Amino acid sequence: MDIEVARKNIGCDSVSIAKRMRSLFYLRNVLLPESARAITEAFGSKSVLLKHEAAYVLGQMRMEESVRVLLDVLSDEDEDEIVRHEAGEALGNFRPREEIVEALRKYSNHPKKPISETCYLALMKLKDGSDIVSKFGSRDPALPMEGSFEEARRILLDKNECLYRRYQAMFYLRDLGTSAAIHALGKSMEDDSALFKHEVSFVFGQMRSRESIPYLIKGMEDEKEHGMVRHECAEALGAIGDDAALKALSKYLHDPCDILRESVEVAVDIHSYMTGDEIEYCNAE
């Protein structure tokens, strides 16, 4: 393992997406400026999935060297909205500064909902002013609410409620982790917001409960669903590591939707890791 090997893997479109993703998360765990710079190689790729994950990782690492790159990605009107959304979310993890706040305010009015909703959430998180790493090891786009299951479920499912409060309810239910919480989250997959449903799918991947599999399969298989939702459903299924999940994933290994097909390849690789005897997923071999 080393940074240079990982950088070369990430920057080469002929390397499998599964291998590039392993390299990316290897770099995520090496908190050095060189790692952050290596990750930026991904933004020259044709892969929307890789660029999206690179933006996510840079937001988790919070290296100051990444801010300019993330601002550039967010502002690039030629970039895919899935990548731009993730850049906006990543910026919400940094300490507030004028250039970040100004950019988020600007793009919170963007006509593309995944971008505008993400930037609104990032602004609300910066306003909250707390820097909390969840028990799942992630910096999330909202802080979990305080309250009861009943209150969280009501807020989560209320489409007229403030989006940030709904996210807070979502993360409360994730941390609660009960069967009732899982089914409340599953019910929320009927929402109109692709961004919201994609985050619920991500949360299911963190929880790794078999009870969420039917909701994830339904989201992945819906050809009318936004690619950001279908891809996140696929990756969550891979993280759960269940045979039923693998069977569902296998149907989409050659799907024409690029981000879904690549996510399925990554998910199958993660499933292999979760159910096999490999010691380390994050490698740059």
Swiss-Prot record:
It comes from the Eukaryota. Gene3D superfamilies: Leucine-rich Repeat Variant. It catalyses: [eIF5A protein]-deoxyhypusine + AH2 + O2 = [eIF5A protein]-hypusine + A + H2O. Binds 2 Fe(2+) ions per subunit. Its cofactor is Fe(2+). GO terms for cellular component: cytoplasm; nucleus. HEAT-like PBS-type repeats lie at residues 50-76, 83-110, 165-191, 229-255. It is an enzyme of class 1 (oxidoreductase). The keyword Cell membrane does not apply. Its EC number is 1.14.99.29. GO terms for molecular function: deoxyhypusine monooxygenase activity; metal ion binding. SUPFAM superfamilies: ARM repeat (SSF48371). Pfam families: HEAT_2. Fe cation 1 binds at H52, E53, H85, E86. Pathway: Protein modification; eIF5A hypusination. HAMAP family: Deoxyhypusine_hydroxylase. This is Deoxyhypusine hydroxylase. It comes from Encephalitozoon cuniculi (strain GB-M1) (Microsporidian parasite). The gene is LIA1.
